[in-house]
Amino acid sequence: MKRFFIKNASLLLPCGLQTGSIEFDSTITALRRSNDSCAPDYECETLDAHGGFVVPGLFDIHTHGAYGADFSDADFSDRNVLNDIHECSIHECSIHECSNYKCNEFDVDSFPLNSPLFRLSRYYLSQGVTSFLATTMTLCAEELFAAMHSIDAFCRMRDEFIKRTPNKLHHLAGAKCIGINLEGPFLSSSKRGSQAECNLLAPDAALFHQLNAASGGRIKLVTVAPELPGAFEFIRSVSGCCTVSEGHSAADYNTAIAAFRAGASHVTHIFNGMNDCLHRSPGIAGAAADLGIPVELICDGLHVHPAVVRGVFRVFGKKTCLISDSLRCAGMPDGRYSLGGQEFVLSDGCAALADGTLAGSAISLADAVRN
């Protein structure tokens, strides 16, 4: 494993920013919180940060895609390859061959590394994102199940690749998918944003559990509008197995408070897809501030004004979770793209539907951090 030494860096540590250096290979091996820039006494590649920031890998909990790919496309299938791999693992001998590779002489070409989701994961990694939640749109039930199967297949394939290849090839797998963020279909029509209205549903715990089973139990976050019929029963049923987030909702303050007390514990992109936070009607944002609930925040300069961004950090502090909410257009040129069966246009960094509704963002999470 190649070793690295980064000197003259501003290190982001639990205690804050510290000037120093860092040594690492597959893991961090040493931190020096000083101006000592002497390289280690072993062979390594030395990099000079010139005072730049060195931060942990980013975790994007809300990203629909980028680099031309979208998790809702449901275009990944590993059935044949995984069947070959599992068959191969049964035969513990070096001469057994399966699907163009040997057990002890592994052929990387056996994996679909050029498929959209592998390319997407490598794009995330190139942007400093080391883990993410694959986020789906409001789709019809058939399409949602297909997306669950596709993401599960990709996760299992990536895990198999990591298990069967040397460390020096692991970057080809890209960032790690930690699970699924189910943004819809249990949303309010009036606050749907770019979600397809025809596919919206009342909160349905049975459907959620079926989707979760189809995903291999990978759903980690689900958004619900708490004012919808059945929302509280849904929250009580689902909150034991994943985080329930309030969002795409016209809920008033009292309803939002009650939903948090019923088990919801997160807010989807604060200020977007919800009622305004007014002095006599604070809505979800005011309820979250009162109870100290973690909130997502899109920092692309379009979804939330920079002054409000600063206010969110002052009010919520460490419970502010930056997200990209990126679409397939992130990392791509201006043009027309699809989103959950709808067309949107990317122009000068703004992704919007034909009626001007913001469709999501075209930034990476690293861009959000910089902003």
Regions found by a protein language model. Give the residues of each.
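N-terminal metal-binding scaffold of metallo-dependent hydrolase/deaminase domains
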Residues: 1-40
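Divalent metal-coordination and catalytic microenvironments
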Residues: 9, 22, 26, 51, ...
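Divalent metal-dependent hydrolysis catalytic cores, especially in the metallo-beta-lactamase
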Residues: 64, 97, 106-107, 118-152, ...
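Charged helix-capping and loop-helix junction motifs
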Residues: 115-116, 147-151, 204-206, 279-285
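Short, electropositive alpha-helical surface patch
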Residues: 144-160, 169-171, 234-243
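Divalent metal-binding pocket/active-site signature
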Residues: 182-283
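Active-site-adjacent C-terminal substructures of enzyme catalytic domains
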Residues: 234, 246, 255-371
